[in-house]
């Protein structure tokens, strides 16, 4: 089983990575280049850079992979302007979902860990959201 965890350097994301490793999954962690990898030291973790601001870039970055599970935990929790919060959280999620759909990636489950998940419900209707 192959899993991708976005926001893997965050508090919740790092625990999801830890649990995936414990269950023996091939674990891929998407973190920003500037993020700390302090809690992601296990040598079994594979790292991937994902540009959530560009659907086209996401397609290129994801194309070599076929993930069984994707846990999307990346997002901004603090922004000076509401537009930035929307752009990072809602648009970034939309780009990720559209890239996966365009690639036809046969994932088994897409898990969205967001407080604004209702805003993007229409892009997720093809998958089960937990």
Question: At which residue positions do the language-model features occur?
Answer:
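N-terminal Rossmann NAD(P)H-binding glycine-rich loop of SDR-like oxidoreductase domains
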Residues: 1-23
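Residues at the starts of beta-strands that form the adenosine-phosphate
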Residues: 2, 26-28, 106-109
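Conserved beta-strand segments of alpha/beta enzyme cores
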Residues: 26, 44-46
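N-terminal Rossmann-fold cofactor-binding loop
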Residues: 30-35, 51-52
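NAD(P)H-binding glycine-rich loop region in Rossmannoid oxidoreductase-like domains
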Residues: 46, 50-95, 99-102
